[in-house]
Amino acid sequence: MKAVAGLAVIALVVLPVSGARADTAADVYKQMGIKVKDVMNSSVATARVLPGDAKQVVAVVTYLTGKKDEANALGVRLDVYRTAGAELVPLFTRDAAKENGGYVGRGEVAILDLDGDGVSEIGIYYDNLKNDLIQERRLDVIVHDAAGFRVAWSGSVSYDATKAVRDVPPDRRDRYLRKLDLDNTRRTKGITLFMTKTMIAVAGSRLPQPKQVQETFPLKPEEP
């Protein structure tokens, strides 16, 4: 398994959520078809991610797949469920390993209210381990609209390619961090995602001082 160096990750405001009971986590693993002994780490919480008063179960699980090849030895999955009595009913799933082409690790969940409406959006973090010389942590931001859950933004929140001399062109050997600008994002009612990008190195050369730039990304269409 590829080694993962300690990374500084994006600072996101995580809303207070109810910690899931141990039996809820076990129910999630069972629903996913994952044995408890294969779970490397997990984030399981209850939060309101759909309109209405009811809370849903949101889980990100990092687990051993049982596959022998390095690319697919670990899996990272996000699943969202509603509860029906004692049952968990699947609503949405995101397989980070499938989307990334394997080589994933250290999945985590963040519960975020990006538009201030009281219904939270979902963030799933994971490490991209495709290249030993590139340290990258990624984030998918998932929103819910009339069409259901969808990935509204996906990108790197921590990236360092300064050591990848052979694999990455010189002009892409950057190092940076991204941090959510929650206040500005909420001012747009979640239509635009604001990020502060801190550049530490550019084209393989460390900057004398880190440089911050503001980035914007579309999240939701403007309401008529």
Residue positions per predicted region:
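"Short basic amphipathic alpha-helical interaction patches in structured regions
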Residues: 72-81, 125, 135-142
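Repeated scaffold domains used in trafficking and secretory/extracellular systems
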Residues: 42-45, 102-110, 162-165
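Extracellular-facing segments of soluble proteins and assemblies that are Gly/Ser/Thr-biased and enriched
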Residues: 96-133
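Bacterial N-terminal signal peptides
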Residues: 6-16
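Terminal domain-start segments
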Residues: 19-103, 203-224
